[in-house]
Amino acid sequence: MSWQAYVDDHLMCDIEGQHLTAAAIIGHDGSVWAQSATFPQFKPEEVAAIIKDFDEPGSLAPTGLHLGGTKYMVIQGEPGAVIRGKKGAGGITVKKTGQALIFGIYDEPLTPGQCNIIVERLGDYLLEQGQ
């Protein structure tokens, strides 16, 4: 299965008539493996800061998580494995795998819990596959 198929079929999937606003799979080096058409244009330093927070949990808390110029308030995640952010009625979930970061961005009516399930389920599967 191509990386784009993982984004299209697993991340941008229909959940009770709703779906993520945007999604992507990005390598630890900041290279885009696959993304939805709606995923924001991001800066390399934004991905570098996210990677740093996985290595040093809590480093994003004072400044927030920035992606494509949007600032998300960092909320409880799983240190070294999952970062969650909130902005207004939406937010972001980032799951780290061995080689990549899985991004899911959502807005109401999709819930934070639904976004977490979508992103973390694919991330866990990729971890099991050695990715």
From Swiss-Prot:
A GO cellular-component term linked to this record: cell cortex
Motif (Involved in PIP2 interaction): 81-97
UniProt-listed Pfam families: Profilin
CDD domains, per the entry: PROF (cd00148)
GO function terms (MF aspect): actin monomer binding
Modified residues (Phosphothreonine): 111
Free-text description of this protein's post-translational modifications in UniProt: Phosphorylated by MAP kinases.
Record's subcellular location: Cytoplasm, Cytoskeleton
This protein's UniProt keywords: Actin-binding, Allergen, Cytoplasm, Cytoskeleton, Disulfide bond, Phosphoprotein
Record-linked SUPFAM superfamilies: Profilin (actin-binding protein)
SMART domains attached to this UniProt entry: PROF (SM00392)
Cysteines joined through disulfide linkages: 13-115
PROSITE patterns according to UniProt: PROFILIN
Description of how the protein assembles with itself and partners: Occurs in many kinds of cells as a complex with monomeric actin in a 1:1 ratio.
Role noted for this protein: Binds to actin and affects the structure of the cytoskeleton. At high concentrations, profilin prevents the polymerization of actin, whereas it enhances it at low concentrations.
PANTHER family linked to this entry: PROFILIN, PROFILIN-3
Protein family according to the UniProt entry: Belongs to the profilin family.
Additional information: The variability of the residues taking part of IgE-binding epitopes might be responsible of the difference in cross-reactivity among olive pollen cultivars, and between distantly related pollen species, leading to a variable range of allergy reactions among atopic patients.
Protein name listed in UniProt: Profilin-4
Taxonomic lineage of the native organism: Eukaryota, Viridiplantae, Streptophyta, Embryophyta, Tracheophyta
